[in-house]
Each structure stands twice: as structure tokens, then as C-alpha cells.
Swiss-Prot record:
Record's subunit section: Oligomerizes as a right-handed, spiral filament on DNA at oriC.
Origin organism lineage: Bacteria, Pseudomonadati, Pseudomonadota, Gammaproteobacteria, Vibrionales
Biological-process GO terms, alphabetical: DNA replication initiation; regulation of DNA replication
SMART domains reported for this sequence: AAA, Bac_DnaA_C
Pfam family, one: Bac_DnaA
A GO cellular component entry from the record: cytoplasm
Protein's name in the database: Chromosomal replication initiator protein DnaA
Gene name linked to the record: dnaA
Coiled coil segments of this chain: none
């Protein structure tokens, strides 16, 4: 059995899994073959449990395929593989180079490609004195235990947890992107709180990108730019929200570029959020956009129905209000764009119930949210979905209704059907009828196909999220 066994498995898994999943869960694994036992080393318990739960069957299948009857026994451990392994074959660390790796290496400064060990708080055994006057700005209310997990934010939450457990080493930088009100800021604060809980001496700073700009301007005005540099380069974790506001601010970008490099070289954690994918941020230098993608980039999508219901139930519980399941589903089916909108609607319902003393029923919600529901129903129609999808893909609405089966038409048609199922209250037969008299089974197939492609294709996932944002805004 050759030492390339695990590398063969890696190469196949990289083809089968979405790039984000592969980078987050599989690539960090190290492997060692000793006799008839293949040991996979995970960096922490969270990764180990996730891999065993999600990918064990795939790994065993590949081992069976490559080894036949000589399939090795699979064993998992936490930590790094042993430095020496006498009388055994040692498989290289699980680091499969991709095109993204090559691009990052070609643009990364030499000192960051071969990062030197740096004395920092994550490895200090003794307490370190920290300036207690530093501005943390981390909101203690936003923690992991009150963040509602769903399919739309599962990867982002998992990445944030890993970073909080292994700051400066797990994924650096971590870049979270998605529309307004989807929970990116909550995750930033949750990471900050978790880091401080684990390491009370850690100097964690959260801020909006505009605050960084304001601080730099004040430093220039007061001839205190060196103090500014020292402050930002001394933090153990820098959490910056809405990085897209750096657009067209050349001096701020220049200073952040050097701050970014200094923090990364010092193994200090950086987490950034934006409303769009790094390469789509206009007005930001290419060298910065390249660096944004050096660690891990994760999309936070609009919450699906089940997550929206869970969010409403959790918020109602926080207010010590009983919310019937059917009421939660009624609200969740009609308000789909983001978490903030859901919370605002629920707050209005609760306030009205407190003022009037009436029970929260579907009829009461329909009355309390009359204007909001009317606006949503007016905005999202099948006709509107068809026009928006056709415009997005630069085809005609008539193409969506036609019998054409070319990929350039069939895929947008399937997306439009899936969006109609997600964003309207029409039945499958009604949706099929609106798309050229198609059968309800065709609509069902389209919905399932798009759900599958959103897991496998970054482009389809992005298109779907963009269309949801456009139609819900």
C-alpha cells in the first residue's frame, strides 16, 4: 500500500465536495499509515466529530475502491501526526494544492509564505498584561448559544467556532459575506466573546470599517499615526464589519494592508465581513482582495423556512412569549429576506399583543403586520420572479416559458421555479402552470435539482442568493 493512498483520497474528495467544505474540513486532516491502520489526525474535537459524521462513508468508500480487500482500519485522533513513524508509512499532511493556492502564493509576500514563529498570547502559558483601556466593543449579548443554526449559516457558524477555539491558526483571515441582516455581525461578536471566555487576557477589538477610517484620520490630524499603528497591530483578534466601506479610500486601504500583513505574520486573528464576495468588492485594491481570500471565505445565505421558524421561536422564548407553531410558520412563510426583518416583525406583534392584551393568533398577526405583509405580497409574484431571473441571465421571459431545453435556458427556468416555491405561497401545480403549463412533477424536480446544485456549485449558490436578495429587497 503506497504512501499516496491518502493523497488519492484527497484528490477524489476535492472533486466531489464543494470547495468551501473541502478547505474547511478535509484539507486540515493529516494522515499516517501504520501497518493496517490509517490514522487521520484532526486539529480539534469539533473537526474530528464533523468529519466522522459527514464524511466517514465517503472516505471508507474511497479506501475500498483503492484497496479492495486490503482496506485499512480507519482510526481518528486529535492533534498532529507523529514526527517519526518507525516501520510505518507516513503520509504527507493533507494539503492538496489548488489553483487558489497557487494564486495566493504568487501574490503573498515572502515573509508571509514562510511565517516565522512569533511570541503571541495564544501560546503564552502565563497571564499577559493587557491595556484594560482598549476598546473591545464586543457585544456580550451576541454569543454562540443564542445564534440559531440552519442550513443557510451552518458553515459560517462552524468556521466561527473553530476560529474561536484556535485563533490565529484555524482560518486566518476568516471572511464572512452575505446580505444585510443575516447574522454576520452576531457571529463576529460571538467569536469575540468566546475568545475572551477562553483567554481573558486576549485583546479583542470589534469595529465597523468606518471606525478604522475615522481613527486613522484622527491619528493623521493629531500627528499620532505611529500610536495608531501600534494599537491596531497589538490586538490579538481584529473583527471588522462591512469591509466594503473601504472602497475608494486609498489611504485607509494602504494602512489596513500593512496592518493586515503585520497581524497575519504575528498569528493574530482577523475576521472580516462584507455584503459581497471579496473579488466583487469594487473600489478596493486587488492586493487587498487577494489577501481577503487567503484563509477561508464563507457565504451566509438568507435563512430557509425551517431556520426562520426556529429564529422566531427562539426570539419569542427570549421574550417569554408563547408562539404557536402555526403562527411562527405563518410569519416565516411571508417574511423571507433576513433575520432582522423577522425580529422586527415579531417585536411589533409582541408589542401589539402587550398593548391590547389579545392572544397571538394568525388573525392577530395578519392585522398587526398588515402593511408589511401587503408589501411582501405585492413585491414577490411569479411574474416578478420570471422578469428578475430573465434579466439576471440576460434571456427573455418567453424563453423561461418555452419548451427549449438548452442549458442556458433550462437552468434559469429551474432556478425561477425554485424561487417561486420559496418566495410565494403558490402550489406546485400553480407554479407549473405559470411556466408554460408544466406538470407539478417538473416543478418538484426543478426544486430538488437546484437544492442539490446549491450544495455542489459555488456559482449556482451565488446566483440563488443574489436573486433572493434582489427579490426580497
Amino acid at each position: 500500500m503506497s504512501s499516496s493512498l491518502w493523497l488519492q483520497c484527497l484528490q477524489q474528495l476535492q472533486e466531489e465536495l464543494p470547495a468551501t467544505e473541502f478547505s474547511m474540513w478535509v484539507r486540515p486532516l493529516q494522515a499516517e499509515l501504520n501497518g493496517n491502520t490509517l490514522t487521520l489526525f484532526a486539529p480539534n474535537r469539533f473537526v474530528l466529530d464533523w468529519v466522522r459524521d459527514k464524511y466517514l462513508n465517503s472516505i471508507n468508500r474511497l479506501l475500498q475502491e483503492y484497496c479492495g480487500n486490503d482496506i485499512p482500519h480507519l482510526h481518528f485522533e486529535i492533534g498532529n501526526k507523529r514526527v517519526t513513524a518507525p516501520k510505518s508509512e507516513t503520509i504527507a499532511p493533507a494539503r492538496t494544492r489548488t489553483a487558489a493556492d497557487v494564486a495566493a502564493e504568487s501574490s503573498a509576500p515572502a515573509q508571509l509564505q514562510a511565517r516565522k514563529p512569533v511570541h503571541n498570547i495564544w501560546r503564552d502559558e502565563e497571564p499577559v498584561a493587557v491595556d484594560l483601556n482598549h476598546r473591545s466593543n464586543v457585544n456580550p449579548k451576541h454569543k454562540f448559544n443564542n445564534f440559531v443554526e440552519g442550513k443557510s449559516n451552518q458553515l459560517g457558524l462552524a468556521a466561527a467556532r473553530q476560529v474561536s477555539d484556535n485563533p490565529g491558526t484555524a482560518y486566518n483571515p476568516l471572511f464572512l459575506y452575505g446580505g444585510t441582516g443575516l447574522g454576520k455581525t452576531h457571529l463576529l461578536h460571538a467569536v469575540g466573546n468566546a475568545i475572551v471566555d477562553n483567554k481573558p487576557n486576549a485583546k479583542v477589538v470589534y469595529m465597523h470599517s468606518e471606525r478604522f477610517v475615522q481613527d486613522m484620520v484622527k491619528a493623521l490630524q493629531n500627528n499620532a499615526i505611529e500610536e495608531f499603528k501600534r494599537y491596531y497591530r497589538s490586538v490579538d483578534a481584529l473583527l471588522i464589519d462591512d469591509i466594503q466601506f473601504f472602497a475608494n479610500k486609498e489611504r485607509s486601504q494602504e494602512e489596513f494592508f500593512h496592518t493586515f500583513n503585520a497581524l497575519l505574520e504575528g498569528n493574530q486573528q482577523i475576521i472580516l465581513t462584507s455584503d459581497r464576495y471579496p473579488k466583487e468588492i469594487n473600489g478596493v485594491e486587488d492586493r487587498l482582495k487577494s489577501r481577503f481570500g487567503w484563509g477561508l471565505t464563507v457565504a451566509i445565505e438568507p435563512p430557509e423556512l425551517e431556520t426562520r421558524v426556529a429564529i422566531l421561536m427562539k426570539k419569542a422564548e427570549d421574550h417569554q412569549i408563547h408562539l404557536a407553531d402555526e403562527v411562527a410558520f405563518f410569519i416565516a412563510k411571508r417574511l423571507r429576506s433576513n433575520v432582522r426583518e423577522l425580529e422586527g416583525a415579531l417585536n411589533r406583534v409582541i408589542a401589539n399583543a402587550n398593548f391590547t392584551g389579545r392572544p397571538i393568533t394568525i388573525d392577530f398577526v395578519r392585522e398587526a403586520l398588515r402593511d408589511l405583509l401587503a408589501l411582501q405580497e405585492k413585491l414577490v409574484t411569479i411574474d416578478n420572479i420570471q422578469k428578475t431571473v430573465a434579466e439576471y441571465y440576460k434571456i427573455k421571459v418567453a424563453d423561461l416559458l418555452s419548451k427549449r431545453r438548452s442549458r442556458s435556458v433550462a437552468r434559469p427556468r429551474q432556478l425561477a421555479m425554485a424561487l417561486a416555491k420559496e418566495l410565494t405561497n403558490h402550489s406546485l401545480p400553480e407554479i407549473g402552470d405559470a411556466f408554460g403549463g408544466r406538470d407539478h412533477t417538473t416543478v418538484l424536480h426543478a426544486c430538488r435539482k437546484i437544492a442539490q446544485l446549491r450544495e455542489e456549485s459555488h456559482d449556482i449558490k451565488e446566483d440563488y442568493s443574489n436573486l433572493i436578495r434582489t427579490l426580497s429587497s
